[in-house]
């Protein structure tokens, strides 16, 4: 008996093989997969059951998608009812599509049987048709009009249908790319005041006003100003725009990034979040009055907690702790550092302690210290030292100091006096009490929560560490890693140590620290400022260094006897300022009178200062300011004066014989006159043979008959005793090699620049112009 496979039977019945397998299993047939076989009787039974199951599906209502289509629905009703389902059914069939088309035509009258098998496909069809209907009724109508069977759809109208599908896709793209309704964007509120800088453009203003550049441009257009987003606007236009928005306008002051003083003042004058800070004390006084002993006693007696046993001072400033309060002492080597810092605007001292020996009284340096402290505007605490020595007279010291306005409180004044013995440590605590009392009266405060600012106490170049600077923090807190600008240098704080050489991570106001990480060595008294980012710090530091270099170039170089003639030649001076220092007054007067007797036309000697004694720093400072020369007779400069003179290129001339000093100055002044030149013949060459070269010209070969001829000499061509031409040598050779000079008795070849009319037996004479000294 012939058997039929399930998949062939399902293909015949146009139903899924899976459904047919399930139907066969319900009837108890031995069927497992679509490849299973059934007998002819079983196949006929399945055919009848499949046809009977398809009848109810024929009376099902039409899909919902066709309810909305009036005209197309009538056309569809006249067509076989099973064609729509056949199209979807054929889409699931894996056989030949031509066969499917034939099957459609062959089974067109079996709609009732096929409808039941295609129920699931009809549901999917309904959903698909509903989607097409939502995309547009016209597109759905076109799709429904093509329901002529799957095979006919693909073979007869496949090309046309593809065009329609593409058209549908195009319509979908147009619908997707169509401009959507703009969403309502909430603009950020306008600022109360528009802070602007002259030259801003629409884009910059848009960022500040939280508006688009297009809106700004439109606003300006309505106000009668036509601009683009990158065009600069003047202040008037920006203010008009702000008024149109109903807000105020304020021009922002442009701050020069290299103006370190501006940033320094901004931080120093910040009154927000103020807190108490330790006082900064400078101890000054005459030599040998016990200043160093007093400082050492204070340091050894009141070391900061945690530093006991480690008293080695690493920097020129330190802190001591007394009664749970800190005091910062600046250990300046002398008044010079104090003066230098004050001259640079770094008034870092809060209180000046003036040390005066009870057995010595007021001395010249004591008076100088008083003047410095008064000029700096700092209160003075007088310490009368060495009260333990025999012959000490503190009252006499007080009487002397009253002449300079330092009247003690006991006498009705406001100056604090403390009598101490630094050697034995007597009344040291009383001195510290007075310092803290004075600081309390002064109400010293700072803001530790901001970027640090302060001044340089000292700086040096260390072979191992590089640039090392001792800083005193005046405002804010200095941290390791902070980008910093110090004077004309910049960098990042790499390390930070306290006065005992111990590394710390931060330094609060009035704390002295030693830092590394700068790109150069700053000067004492320079301000330092910490910036928010390294980029700004670098820009400020580089700009300051550039300006300092330019200023140095513009500054007139100091005159010396060596460059005196060149200086006068440029017309920069017509007088010679001189400072005279000698060992005795008689020598001073004799030297001054002798110099003023020198008579040279157009030049005069200007004695701006004359005195007895060694050449001091003040003399060097005066010479620097006056562009003068210092002449010393039987005196020497002090080490500091010598160092400062070398730094500032000040000319110091030292003599032991008055005549030598006068002669040296006279020679320099004569050099300032217009020089006289005369011709000096170097040698002669006799031309003996000529050579022609197309690229070079005429080459004269000859013998040096007298003197010598040099490459840089001027030459004249003499023919029969008459000068034919004067010019310069073009080349000079000995054999084939270039020569700088050829001496008498040697042959050479030479050319003359821009001249070729050389003949045999001509004489070429070499010469140069020599300056004749003024007599």
From Swiss-Prot:
The keyword Magnesium does not apply. Signal peptide: none annotated. Residues 331-334 are annotated as: G3. GO terms for cellular component: cytosol. Residues 310-314 are annotated as: G2. It holds the Pfam family GTP_EFTU. Residues 285-292 are annotated as: G1. It is found in: Cytoplasm. Residues 276-445 form the tr-type G domain. CDD domains: IF2_eIF5B, IF2_mtIF2_II, mtIF2_IVc. GTP binds at residues 285-292, 331-335, 385-388. Residues 385-388 are annotated as: G4. Residues 421-423 are annotated as: G5. One of the essential components for the initiation of protein synthesis. Protects formylmethionyl-tRNA from spontaneous hydrolysis and promotes its binding to the 30S ribosomal subunits. Also involved in the hydrolysis of GTP during the formation of the 70S ribosomal complex. PANTHER family: TR-TYPE G DOMAIN-CONTAINING PROTEIN, TRANSLATION INITIATION FACTOR IF-2-RELATED. Belongs to the TRAFAC class translation factor GTPase superfamily. Classic translation factor GTPase family. IF-2 subfamily. This is Translation initiation factor IF-2. The lineage of its organism: Bacteria, Bacillati, Bacillota, Bacilli, Lactobacillales.
């Amino acid at each position: 008996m012939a058997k039929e496979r399930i998949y062939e039977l399902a293909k015949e019945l146009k139903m899924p093989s899976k459904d047919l397998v399930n139907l066969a299993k319900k009837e108890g047939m031995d069927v497992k997969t679509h490849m299973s076989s059934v007998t002819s009787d079983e196949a006929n039974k399945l055919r009848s059951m499949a046809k009977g199951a398809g009848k109810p599906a024929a009376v099902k209502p039409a899909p919902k998608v066709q309810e909305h289509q009036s005209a197309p629905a009538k056309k569809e009703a006249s067509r076989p009812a099973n064609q729509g389902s056949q199209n979807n059914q054929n889409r699931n069939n894996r056989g030949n599509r031509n066969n499917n088309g034939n099957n459609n035509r062959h089974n067109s009258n079996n709609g009732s049987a096929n409808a039941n098998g295609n129920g699931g496909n009809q549901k999917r069809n309904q959903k698909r048709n509903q989607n097409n209907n939502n995309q547009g009724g016209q597109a759905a109508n076109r799709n429904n009009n093509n329901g002529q069977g799957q095979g006919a759809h693909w073979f007869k109208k496949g090309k046309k249908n593809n065009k329609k599908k593409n058209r549908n896709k195009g319509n979908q793209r147009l619908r997707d790319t169509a401009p959507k309704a703009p969403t309502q964007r909430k603009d950020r509120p306008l600022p109360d005041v528009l802070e602007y800088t002259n030259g801003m453009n629409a884009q910059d203003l848009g960022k500040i006003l939280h508006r688009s550049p297009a809106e700004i441009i439109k606003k300006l257009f309505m106000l009668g100003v036509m601009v683009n987003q990158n065009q600069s606007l003047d202040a008037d236009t920006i203010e008009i725009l702000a008024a149109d928005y109903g807000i105020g306008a304020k021009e922002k002051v442009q701050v020069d990034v290299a103006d370190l003083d501006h940033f320094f003042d901004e931080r120093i004058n910040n009154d927000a979040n103020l807190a108490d800070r330790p006082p900064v004390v400078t101890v000054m006084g005459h030599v040998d009055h016990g200043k160093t002993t007093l400082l050492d006693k204070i340091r050894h007696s009141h070391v900061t907690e945690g530093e006991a046993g480690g008293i080695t001072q690493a920097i020129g400033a330190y802190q001591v702790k007394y009664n749970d309060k800190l005091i910062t002492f600046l250990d300046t080597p002398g008044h010079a550092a104090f003066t230098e810092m004050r001259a640079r605007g770094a008034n870092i001292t809060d209180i000046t302690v003036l040390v005066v020996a009870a057995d010595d009284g007021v001395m010249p340096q004591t008076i100088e210290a008083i003047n410095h402290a008064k000029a700096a505007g700092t209160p003075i605490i007088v310490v009368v030292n060495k009260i333990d020595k025999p012959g000490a007279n503190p009252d006499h010291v007080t009487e002397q100091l009253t002449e300079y306005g330092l009247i003690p409180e006991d006498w009705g004044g406001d100056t604090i006096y403390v009598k101490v013995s630094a050697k034995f440590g007597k009344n040291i605590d009383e001195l510290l009490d007075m310092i803290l009392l004075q600081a309390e009266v002064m109400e010293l405060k700072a803001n530790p929560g901001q970027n640090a600012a302060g001044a340089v106490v000292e700086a040096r170049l260390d072979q191992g560490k590089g640039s090392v600077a001792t800083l005193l923090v005046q405002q804010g807190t200095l941290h390791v890693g902070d980008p910093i600008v110090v004077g004309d240098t910049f960098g990042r704080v790499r390390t930070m140590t306290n006065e005992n050489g111990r590394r710390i991570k931060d330094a609060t106001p009035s704390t002295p620290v030693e830092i590394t990480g700068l790109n150069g060595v700053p000067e004492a008294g320079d301000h330092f400022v910490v910036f928010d980012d390294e980029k700004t710090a670098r820009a400020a530091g580089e700009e300051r260094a550039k300006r300092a270099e330019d200023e140095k170039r513009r500054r007139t170089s100091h005159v010396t006897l060596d460059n005196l003639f060149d200086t006068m030649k440029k017309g920069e001076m017509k007088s010679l300022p001189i400072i005279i220092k000698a060992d005795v007054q008689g020598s001073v007067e004799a030297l001054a009178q002798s110099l003023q007797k020198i008579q040279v036309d157009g030049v005069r000697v200007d004695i701006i200062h004359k005195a007895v004694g060694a050449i001091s720093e003040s003399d060097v400072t005066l010479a620097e300011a006056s562009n003068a020369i210092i002449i010393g007779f039987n005196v020497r400069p002090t080490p500091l004066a010598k160092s400062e003179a070398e730094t500032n290129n000040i000319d110091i001339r030292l003599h032991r014989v008055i005549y030598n000093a006068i002669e040296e100055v006279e020679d320099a002044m004569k050099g300032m006159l217009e020089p006289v030149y005369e011709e000096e013949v170097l040698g002669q060459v006799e031309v003996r043979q000529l050579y022609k070269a197309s690229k070079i010209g005429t080459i004269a070969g000859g013998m040096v008959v007298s003197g010598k001829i040099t490459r840089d000499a001027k030459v004249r061509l003499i023919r029969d005793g008459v000068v034919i031409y004067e010019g310069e040598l073009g080349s000079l050779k000995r054999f084939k090699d270039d020569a700088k000079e050829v001496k008498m008795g040697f042959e050479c070849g030479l050319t003359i620049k821009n001249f070729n009319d050389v003949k045999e037996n001509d004489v070429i004479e070499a010469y140069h112009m020599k300056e004749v000294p003024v007599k």
